[in-house]
Amino acid sequence: MRIDLHTHSTASDGTDTPAELVRNAAAAGLDVVALTDHDTVGGYEAAKRALPAGLTLVTGAELSCRLVLPPSGGGGSGASEDGAAGVSLHMLAYLFDPAEPELARERELVRDDRVPRARGMVDKLRELGVPITWEQVARIAGDGAVGRPHVATAMVDLGVVESVSDAFTPQWLANGGRAYVEKHELDPFDAIRLVKAAGGVTVFAHPLALKRGQCVPESAIAELAAAGLDGIEVDHMDHDEPTRARLRGLAADLGLLTTGSSDYHGSRKTCRLGEYTTDPEIYGEIARRATGACPGAGPGGGARGPGGAGAHTAPGEVGRGGREV
């Protein structure tokens, strides 16, 4: 069974529509795919309507978070009064109730901040001599949630950088980079609490992706685990083999699940659907822990999880509070 738990559509910063994404997932030989657009579940219904036979769709989102660290660099769950530094991170949330009001409100706050943030990055790039315009970025984003990848794509189109990845450097858009602009982000401890309250499961995405900027220290990951974090994403394109081995050891020490995922964005990045996958036993445990929503199977039913512990449902099954998921 092939399982990819980290993908993006045009509902955020991918290039595949939700319908195209699930069709491409089936064509890639996947049995299970999670749609984890940034801070939104807006693409889920369209993906569900287009779900091919034999493919299971997992409700998900990639939540934008910021961990405040004390000046010493240790972990911590709250801001210090003397201006502690913060580290941006992404929290994958699975099988939560999308209608849970507090979590929905936080996702909306993050989304509302995306346009002014992207405009700020455009302004900084123009100050650096890049002939980029807001109209160009908005056109690239279309109906999606505008973000750094759209700005990066504009930079590629202008010939400023060769690839989207090349824009995510300290010279340009990486965390703390010359054209970087902060945005509203959840405290990760709050994110864990809110997702759990909505019946979901949390996995820390690409925790040691050094090319993206400063990473969260392992001491802070231990604190997140103590606060209820379920797992960490280990097999990811931004982790080399030594990093993956290090993360597997950390997960074993902390009792965390380990996942693997493509972080697929369509043509915007080079990664392919199913390039990295999650072990079926791990996926089964994620499904068993979740109470907020159930994976949805395409016509003919989806793949069965280990032991069949209620991990998959027929289309139209209702989740928490009677809401169809």
Predicted segments, located by residue:
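C-terminal appended segment following the main domain
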Residues: 234-305, 316-325
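An N-terminally biased module of ancient metal coordination in phosphate/nucleic-acid-related enzymes
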Residues: 1-87, 172-174, 186, 192-193, ...
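Extended substrate/RNA-proximal surfaces in nucleic-acid metabolism proteins
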Residues: 52-222, 277, 282-293, 301, ...
